Amino acid sequence: LMAENTDLAGSVIFEIGQSAYDGRSSTAVRNMRRLAELGFRFSLDKVRRLDMDFQELARSDVRFLKIGAQSLQDEIVESGEGPVFRALPDLAAEDFAALARRYGVDIIAEKIEDERQTVEVLELNIGYGQGHLFGEPRAIRGAILAETDPPADYLQAPLRRRAG
């Protein structure tokens, strides 16, 4: 089915949870590879562990890691060299996003609820964020249908008879 719809590859990103990704079967690995060969990309969601094999992520065509903004902050500890993540004590916390980018992976901080979290995410050099601060989730069906409605004055205009 996806082979027949490769024109969607630039618009579709498959999301998989970190634990599901870690527990993939060989069949799932092959299927991900096939989708990647068709141009589809992947995003790892529900990321809880930051000590990842970035080479493996790149080989699997994972292009995004979605990590909760609060989870990122909860993982930070102070070291003699400055802030680091517990799982990566040899890497400055502010260098984590750059490390991921070297492997073609962008970090998305999610569940950003207030401006304080935005500042904290920016201090980690993370370029993407999402959450209630940027707009609450909303039903899109009504909004999409409203965009396709004809203008109100068009609907209210009287019908004119043709002279003839």
Question: PLM features: residue spans?
Answer:
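EAL-family c-di-GMP phosphodiesterase catalytic domain
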Residues: 11, 15-23, 40-164
